[in-house]
Amino acid sequence: MSTTSLQHFPHSYSPFSSSRSLNRMAQSQTSGLDTLAEGSQYALEQLQMSREAAGSGEATDSVGKPKDQFQVDNDNHHNNHSLSNFKNPSQRDPLVEARSTIRKNSASAPVRRRISRACDQCNQLRTKCDGQNPCAHCIDFGLTCEYARERKKRGKASKKDLAAAAAAAAAAATNSGQPNGSSGKEDAALVGGHTSPDRRPTINGRYDPAFEVPRNLNGSAQHSEASGMVGMQNSQHLPPHSQSSMGGGLEGLPLNGYNGLNDSGRPSMPVPELQSLHMLHNSHTNPRSPSSILPHHRYNGGYNDSAYSLMNPQEPNSTSISHFRLGSSTENPPNSFLGLSPPAQSPGWLPLPSPSPANFPSFSMASFSTTLRYPVLHPVLPHIASIIPQSLACDLLDVYFTSSSSSHLSPQSPYVVGYIFRKQSFLHPTKPRVCTPGLLASMLWVAAQTSDAPFLTSPPSARGRVCQKLLELTIGLLRPLIHGPAPGETSPNYAANMVINGVALGGFGVSMDQLGAQSSATGAVDDVATYVHLATVISASEYKAASMRWWTAAWSLARELKLGRELPPNTPHARPDAERDGDPDADLSKRHPPPLITSMGHGPGNTIINITEEEREERRRLWWLLYATDRHLALCYNRPLTLLDKECEGLLQPMNDDLWQAGDFATYRQAGPPVECTGHSMFGYFLPLMTILGEIVDLQQARNHPRFGLAFRNSAECEAQVLEIARQLDVYAQSLKEFETRYTSSLALGAAETEAAMDGSHPNHVSPSGRSSSTVESRVNESIVHTKMVVAYGTHIMHVLHILLAGKWDPINLLDDNDLWISSESFVAAMGHAVGAAEAAAEILEYDPDLSFMPFFFGIYLLQGSFLLLLTADKLQGDASPSVVRACETIVRAHEACVVTLNTEYQRTFRKVMRSALAQVRGRLPEDFGEQQQRRREVLALYRWTGDGSGLAL
């Protein structure tokens, strides 16, 4: 068929020419063909058939039409004639007659109509939607019902429209110096967005106000919108199958045979929403922004209906139009962000790989116009708009900072091992902390692992899908810290494969410009915290070996940032934020004490950065968290230490969590790694134990040295180190007793005095103060229980460290007992600590039945404290003492609780092993006793702590 005969097709099936023709089209479509109605060629054929079947009805439809409408009808007649070259109408006469018979027989039946569009929630969940706002499904599940996603359409754009668009763009460039009034009118006429009232767009004969959004803008806004879309087809005013003609006369432009790309029908962005996105305009200056990775000398940022300009880049006239046509360059700076993804596969003449959701996120425009509960999320909103609703993002941020106790801060999420940031700084309604999008995405990902939001629980697969997308987004936003391929070697699926390889096989490299003048100290700290979030969740999964890559990246970056050193003292002069002193709404914690001026970065390009006391404390807490996990994972995976005590001997110890969250920064604290229990948080009771564990790990590595280990084990130096570590454990035990006395006896005494005062002052009636006394008493009781729980956990881990100090970490070596250690005094002392650890585990189960207080850390200490009990049960069997039997029962209960809270393979495996041994202790010997012993040995052989063993990292 000829190209000339097809250039007028958009005129012939414009749905706004007549409302009656639309009704006839809807009635002529049978239910069996509804699914085909979205094809553009099928729409042409059905329109032609319906007009032929209508016959003389066309004459009556023309009554009362305006003059321009007659012109459209004449064009339609001409197009009908030109269609004969495309397909002979006589060949479809039997089909027309058959469909006419079907319409007559089904005239009495109700017309089946499909909804034009499902809401965003139903579309994402693949759920049937009734098309209402809000729809029934969103009402039932309490979801936010929105119709904010982009409209997409099938088929190619008309060559005539594309040529008109290119000509209009060129005309706009030449007429840019005209007065605003004349240019605005011409642009409005070209865009076609301002029609007379009698020609307003309708759908099925009804006026739809959604198409009239640009009419509500003021004059300047209309002009800015029209100038940004000059010569372009304003397709948000049309249904997906319609395109309006822009005029001819441009057939001579060099299109080189390209007929166009899929027009996605994206709505234009209202002007007020552009103002709400001002924080994205500087993304090209942020080296962490994914869009900054793209070459931007030929691209324009923004939005429009056309995905690409179709001019050949090699043509001489292609300089001004052979680039992305995503909006007006006057509204957005070049390459501010590429919010709308290109088609799945870019054309061959455009050298771009297929984008991944992480690097080219889709935008939901309506979400930015609503009020954001937590403004801290602004940097990440453009990236998560197509993943989760805005309200859910705020809820997930609440989940991240939720505490399981009202008396003392304790993270409820098992993947938040300690609070690095202040809750008030993140959730501040007006002046939140400035965060990188990667950190925010990782926080949402961590919270989504355990959130009970309906969006994540219905259907059951929703959580996995959302968490996977958030993980890909987080890794994509950290791309500057991950090695990319060499130029020219990028495959179309590299961005997607990078996510999988980043978790399992990917390498990491630190970009030095991230640590120099182009990056703030907060941004660099945010990157380390993002790695911590990723590593923590992966460590708790079955991919423990893969998590070491993320931990190594976090440790290396923390060392390069020198987080283990204190920054220089405050400088009293030069206060850049002094103008905020008179602001009553400013966050006082940001200004107290005065900030310091320090030099960050490397080399001569150092920059002066303002560091507040809060940012100093964030650096300290991040280092101490990495310090503790380094020692914890050294035990888990049988590896040497990475962060040394020498690197942080001058670093102040972290603050008390309650004071930290309240913004009460302490002026005096001790420096260096702690060895005494000081508080209820991980930094207060667990960090001192990890300091001692680091000494034990160094001692164990020296004992197992392949060349010097034997001489060291028999030397006096080894004995001296053992005695010193034992002394440190005794110091910790004493501090634990003082901690319990301070937070239980004093609180109980204070509560009793308060109750007595209330009883003496109000003997006959209950006052508000009397009613509040019950609340105070409950808070005191909760604080006492929380303190006892901390003491129980600390006691258990302390006993396990005594066992580890003896040097017997490997379960197979214990069962073999080649050195007859079971008959030594050291074994008797270690066995006493094993029973003490089991008794402490019983107290833990009393105060924390589901072991949810510290599930990420507790598993390995429960396991190492159980090996000696397993050895005793295996050797003594029915002759074991009652205390050993009770200890084995407690260990089995504790492992079952651990499996429920944070399910991991090694805990499930060891629970079966302990159950089998406990049955033998009770005298229930199976027939295949030897086979069961061999099976237990094979299972335990998976987890080795010998010289070449990898512990839990299978």
Swiss-Prot record:
SUPFAM superfamilies according to UniProt: Zn2/Cys6 DNA-binding domain
DNA-binding region: 119-145
Database matches in Gene3D superfamilies: Zn(2)-C6 fungal-type DNA-binding domain
Subcellular location: Nucleus
Compositional bias of kind Polar residues: 22-33, 82-91, 174-183, 764-777
Location of region: Disordered: 1-39, 51-93, 173-226, 310-333, 566-607, 758-777
An example Gene Ontology molecular-function term: zinc ion binding
Low complexity bias spans: 8-21
Alphabetized UniProt keyword annotations: Activator, DNA-binding, Metal-binding, Nucleus, Transcription, Transcription regulation, Zinc
Main location, first listed in the record: nucleus
Compositional bias segments (type: Basic and acidic residues): 64-78, 574-590
GO biological process: DNA-templated transcription; positive regulation of DNA-templated transcription; xylan catabolic process
A UniProt-annotated Pfam family: Zn_clus
GO terms for cellular component: nucleus
Keyword Transmembrane: no
Similarity comment text for this entry: Belongs to the xlnR/xlr1 family.
Described purpose of this protein according to its UniProt entry: Transcriptional activator of the xylanolytic system. Involved in the regulation of extracellular cellulolytic and xylanolytic genes and in the regulation of the intracellular activities of D-xylose catabolic genes in the pentose catabolic pathway (PCP) in response to the presence of D-xylose.
Protein name: Xylanolytic transcriptional activator xlnR
Species annotation: Aspergillus fumigatus (strain ATCC MYA-4609 / CBS 101355 / FGSC A1100 / Af293) (Neosartorya fumigata)
Protein encoded by which gene: xlnR
